[in-house]
């Protein structure tokens, strides 16, 4: 059984599949009452459950086994990034972030941003799809657009880094970061941060890396 379904409506001994998930299971995969599937909740929970009915609009499943904190990481990574103009590149970034286990993603709005707004629902759907396809149990927290200045000032992670291209020899991230910690990584083109003054970033304990 190598396919996951997603639901956040998890109760003591049963769960409810969202209509789109239930429709795929019942109409496409031809699941029947009594058939078993695996459901994840996006927060480390994994549930083996049996269909109790075949109603896509109100699909109940009986939980027969459950596990918590499956694949829980020993670190926390928060990525701040100015979203690319291309939908394909943005969706690729979301997919890879889920696959490698990024815990939080914030989209940064700057004077040079190629995209001034994002569709959170579409992005979340892509993240859920990637989680199921890669057999993961955690979804990253995905935040709406925020200004670069507000993001940097309000960032509360223990270790903070900025990917920055320059002629100076900046430290490599693997040599800069300590193990098993709480990280914030700000990623974008160099021009994005010119108006923020790099010396101010250093005063806010953001370290440059390449």
Give the ranges of each region predicted by the language model.
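A mid-sequence, solvent-exposed acidic-amphipathic segment
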Residues: 145-179, 183-185
